[in-house]
């Protein structure tokens, strides 16, 4: 509860922060000790000769720059589509994170302990859902086509985004009246409370599905490509799409803040919703194009095999 204190008179949030800092420092010292022990006891015993070390040094390539990554991605339409998938995912997740944390701060009403408890619960639920989806992910990829499996993540985001953005916009419009959104089992549910809950599960499911579905389908898209594009393309996509995805959402918010200097993050929700619609359109455009390209490669390979057999 807000303002609650421990027996020693220290604020509860401050005390929990001290505990977390102690855990982080202890874990860091443990990692340092483990790293030192591996270098002293394990690595010297490995039977690696000078030729193997030299070959490893040759195989290790330099990470491409942002401009080099863009140039390489533009050479292949498949890589461009994969980079667009990574970019769209990163931007949308950034929108959701910023808006959800803003709604959570309003819902917590300045209670830092409640905010911290929600974030801890969010991490726990995300981990549980990730474990479940990692187990079920293989079955999903076997039972459905590549396009169907790859489209599950954006479809989930679209369905939940309608509720999420809608509740925030409605809550901002009816903030002065203070009217609840609806009543469930005698309990009045406000628009902020609904946005917090929808954003909670939306973020947890989407972030968990990244490891089990999004990354898996993305890696499958590299399979039909030739070896050079496959090896260099992964690094280029990670640099171009990954970095742009992380910074794209922040760039959008910065531009909107410049255009509307007195606007709050909540008041910018309609503009972010419109931007999300545009991003989802690009996402599905890239999925359709990539799906056609993958199936064209597969059909061509099957035709070659049939001709060879004939």
Name each region found by the language model:
Residues 1-26, 144-151, 190-191, 255-281:
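A membrane-interface helix-boundary motif in multi-pass transporters
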Residues 169-184, 207, 297, 301-310:
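C-terminal structured domains
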Residues 1-8, 63-72, 77, 81, ...:
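Substrate-agnostic recognition of the 12-TM MFS/MFS-like secondary transporter fold
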Residues 1-86, 91, 103-111, 277-310:
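Intracellular loop-helix junctions on the cytosolic face of multi-pass helical membrane proteins
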Residues 155-192:
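C-terminal ends and interior cores of transmembrane alpha-helices
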Residues 39-40, 167-172, 261, 290-292:
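Short helix-capping/hinge motifs at transmembrane helix termini and TM-loop junctions
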Residues 19-33, 84, 88, 125, ...:
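Lipid-exposed faces of alpha-helical membrane segments in multi-pass integral membrane proteins
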């Amino acid at each position: 509860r807000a303002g609650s204190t421990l027996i020693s008179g220290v604020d509860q949030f401050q005390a929990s922060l001290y505990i977390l800092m102690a855990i982080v420092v202890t874990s860091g010292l443990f990692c340092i000790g483990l790293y030192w022990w591996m270098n002293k006891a394990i690595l010297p015993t490995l039977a690696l000769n000078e030729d193997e070390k030299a070959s490893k040094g040759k195989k290790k390539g330099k990470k491409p720059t942002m401009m080099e990554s863009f140039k390489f991605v533009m050479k292949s339409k498949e890589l461009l589509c994969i980079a667009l998938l990574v970019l769209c995912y990163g931007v949308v997740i950034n929108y959701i994170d910023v808006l959800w944390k803003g709604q959570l701060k309003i819902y917590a009403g300045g209670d830092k302990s409640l905010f911290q408890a929600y974030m801890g619960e969010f991490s726990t639920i995300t981990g549980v859902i990730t474990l479940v989806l990692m187990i079920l992910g293989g079955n999903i990829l076997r039972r459905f086509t590549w396009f169907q499996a790859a489209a599950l993540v954006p479809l989930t985001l679209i369905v939940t985004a309608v509720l999420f953005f809608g509740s925030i916009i409605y809550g901002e419009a009816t903030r002065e009246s203070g009217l609840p959104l609806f009543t469930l089992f005698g309990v009045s549910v406000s628009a902020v409370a609904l946005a917090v809950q929808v954003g909670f599960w939306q973020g947890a499911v989407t972030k968990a599905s990244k490891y089990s579905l999004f990354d898996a389908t993305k890696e499958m898209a590299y399979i039909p490509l030739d070896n050079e594009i496959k090896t260099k393309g992964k690094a280029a996509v990670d640099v171009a799409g990954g970095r742009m995805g992380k910074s794209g959402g922040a760039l959008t918010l910065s531009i909107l803040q410049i255009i509307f200097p007195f606007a709050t993050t909540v008041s910018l929700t309609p503009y972010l919703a419109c931007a999300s619609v545009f991003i989802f359109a690009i996402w599905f455009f890239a999925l359709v194009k990539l799906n056609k390209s993958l199936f064209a490669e597969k059909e061509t390979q099957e035709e070659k095999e049939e001709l060879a057999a004939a």
